[in-house]
Amino acid sequence: MQAFGPPNEGPLQGLVASRIETYGGRHQTSAHSTAGNLFPRGGPGVDPSRRRLQHYVPFAKGSGQTRGMSPLVLREPDPEKRHGSYFGVGPPHSPKLKEVTRAHELEIRLHTFSMFGMPRLPPEDRRHWEIGEGGDSALTMEKSWKELVLEHKEMNRQLCHQQEALWELLTTELIYLRKLKIMTDLLAAGLLNLQRVGLLTEVSAETLFGNVPNLIRAHRRFWEEVLQPILEDTRTSGQPLDPVSLQNGFLTFGQRFQPYVQYCLRVKQTMAYAREQQDTNPLFHTFVQWCEKHKRSGRQTLGDLLIKPHQRITKYPLLLQAVRKRSPEPRAQEALNAMIEAVESFLRHINGQVRQGEEQESLMAVAQRIGPYEVLEPSSEEVEKNLRPFSTLDLMTPVLGVAPEYTRQLLLEGPVRVKEGREGKMDVYLFLFSDVLLVTKPQRKADRAKVIRPPLMLEKLVCRPLRDPNSFLLIHLTEFQCVSSALTVHCPSSTERARWLEKTQHAQTTLQKLKGEQYIQQKRELLALYRNQGTESPSTRPSTPSPSPEDSQSSAEGRTLEFAIIPRLVVTEDTDEDTPSMPDDASDSGYGTLIPSSPKDSHSPLNRLRSKALRRDPRLTFSTLELRDVPLRPQPPDPQAPQRRSAPELPEGILRGGSLPRRAPPIWSEEEDETLASGNVVVETLHRAQRRSPLPHSPTHTDSAGESPWESSDEDEGLLSPELRPRSLREDMLREIREELANQRIDGASEPEPGNGKPRRLTLAQLQRMRVPHIIQLDTPLSTSEV
């Protein structure tokens, strides 16, 4: 019969031929036959003697061996199928055939992934996409908190509800972590493995899932450092979960989950990109469907997985509020309030960043609608060439004088007619932004409008309504508040005019408020910077901002009143060895001037500076001191140089007529005491003073005026040569010692003979009596003023 002839010998006829045509003969091929073929690109050759049987196997009714023989093994692929064609038409390298071949190869790859699992990524991709391989064993929990808490049956209802709320926080954290792993271990890993063999290379895995690994790492650290320890404590002790243990972890919520800022900024673009790829890319749509049907996906769609991070980060305050509602203890309430505030503060930060990003995108879209900047008509090509670098308007620049996070916004736009001077009306299109008004003219052949007038800054703009209900006047001022330009704006209706005036006035008010807030914020930051520098500075000068003239005057008056009265003191020392020496802040060594009006226990830095300064200068030992010679606030050029301090304040007991406290014995030996009987007491006293306090040879320190406080001025000592100054100092000290000794009333000492200016020599007994406490005698106070 002709029907049993070779398949390639003319058209087939008869019943068998019709069956062959129906089930896929040489003239028609079904997609299922090619899809089920193990050798679509040409496999092992088939014995020519068996080629005639390959089309008749499905209808054979012979033995069981023949019935069980697979037609895929006996059938030889058609020549067209060796090129990957489903339909056997067209050249093998046409775009349609390539697409069909890629779809078939994608199905084979996905089937291989289902059978043998997802291949591991290459080493260059593992570092970013693989998170904690083998570390998921710690991400396990019991089915209920009652398995951990031993005495859960004896707990009251409110405490049980608290444990349920805490358990919900822990369980939802693990569930969310597993959903994040679906995106990296299934979707991202599958896409990257397909791209390694040349499939879906046009899809960006970084755009879809680039920030997800950072989210997983953040949540794993949060689980290991915050949530898992409280779970382990309950497992060990059997006590209920303590919400206070979560406080330290949630107080650092913002630092832990910084990757959410970037993710939330890009989530809308990511979801739009995923929808676009599914709608326009059949291969990607096939891949996504395979992933959604995978057993690991849990019937989660790609859109559901991409929106999960945004939903999770906003759910933390609700979970903590549920725990707080069921925690009556004040300690737990306080801790939970702090945790909720930390989380909500971070969410406000994210919302601000998202809002700023949306405003930036909106401004960019508006900026693309505004074309060239042609506010001048150049007179020549040379002029035009020089104007070209300055003929670009960039609306993306920040607004001047406001916080950097504030973005310029488009408030109003619309067509109007303007008139400038005596010229006729012109149709323009106005753009009202947060800080500027643009006058543009639409272009017929383009969608962009060109700027025809210089930008009108709102802070220099004045709007005045005119008698015409549809018109108002725009006046632009200079820095000198003079008119720069004026435009008469004619709106289509009175409603439009009212709308333009209202929006412009509101924008000006808002801009002024924002600039005021920014000025206050900058002033606070500057004051804080000054305070920080003052704290770190080693100088004794208090580091404060520059005071106003009124403050400086009041402070100077206060210091003048404090040191206005400086008494003359005649000081004697007690050298009793049995009396312990008093501390410097409660006694006077006789080297300084005590102030009667000072409080008893004054420990001001100025007094300590003066005390040290007086001890270092021997010329102040037996002389009356005037504070004008000692700067109140010295500024040594070397921070390591010794600082001058003030003299200690006069104790209250001294002010009431008491004696000075006793000091340590003077620096001389008993042998020197024996020599005093035959020596001159004035000379010996001067000798001891020079030995005890030699003139310092340290580098001279200068005060704020650039003068040395230890150098005698010309007004006090006159213009003396260096050779005469020591002698003058010696004579002054001798004269002052004579006056001090003359004012002392020593028991048992006879008055000196009249006419004899030299003091009489004292015996050892008289000298010992001089060492006992004596009453301080004050001379007439001297009024001094600070220079």
UniProtKB/Swiss-Prot annotation:
Residues 533-762 are annotated as: Disordered. The keyword Cytoplasm applies. Its main location: other. SMART domains: PH, RhoGEF. Coiled coil: none annotated. GO terms for molecular function: GTPase activator activity; guanyl-nucleotide exchange factor activity. Gene3D superfamilies: Dbl homology (DH) domain (1.20.900.10), Pleckstrin-homology domain (PH domain)/Phosphotyrosine-binding domain (PTB) (2.30.29.30). Keywords: Cell projection, Cytoplasm, Cytoskeleton, GTPase activation. It is found in: Cell projection, Microvillus; Cytoplasm, Cytoskeleton, Spindle; Cleavage furrow. This is Pleckstrin homology domain-containing family G member 6. It comes from Mus musculus (Mouse).
